[in-house]
Regions:
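A short alpha-helical cap/connector motif
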Residues: 1-102, 106-138
């Protein structure tokens, strides 16, 4: 749960960083109405007409099952997705290229870095990589 003070700080920093470059008026997040991850991903898929989607880390399919892509691969060694491997194991034999890759796997710095580097090898030109939990404690 984010405190009111934290919300204020985030809104303040967001406006300092982005308002000057992108927006003409002050932007405030409506914290209770933020879109879900799958809504953001589906909007990107729809707007850019992406067809091939890869998700690294699909815990219980909370996100993966709601993705509307023609072709989707979900990699998780424990639960969710449609490939039961670690991301390292998957990328060793990967032959696919993806329009959109969502990284939400093991949340350790070294593994996140590996997942980003591996994803870049299999990202189509003009593709997008999204990260969740990109500030691990390690």
């Amino acid at each position: 749960m984010i405190s009111i003070r934290q919300k204020y700080k985030i809104n303040y920093l967001f406006n300092i960083i982005f308002k000057e470059f992108f927006f003409k008026k002050k932007i405030l997040f409506e914290w209770d109405n933020l879109p879900k991850r799958y809504e953001i991903i589906n909007t990107i898929i729809q707007n850019y007409k992406f067809k091939k989607y890869l998700e690294i880390g699909c815990f219980k399919d909370d996100n993966f099952s709601k993705i509307n892509a023609e072709y989707k691969i979900g990699v998780d060694p424990v639960s969710g997705g449609n490939i039961r491997k670690t991301s390292d194991e998957y990328f060793e034999n990967c032959e696919d290229f993806f329009d959109l890759i969502f990284i939400d796997g093991l949340h350790h710095y070294e593994q996140v870095k590996k997942d980003i580097n591996n994803s870049l090898k299999f990202l189509k030109k003009g593709g997008v990589i999204l990260l969740h939990d990109c500030l691990p404690s390690s």
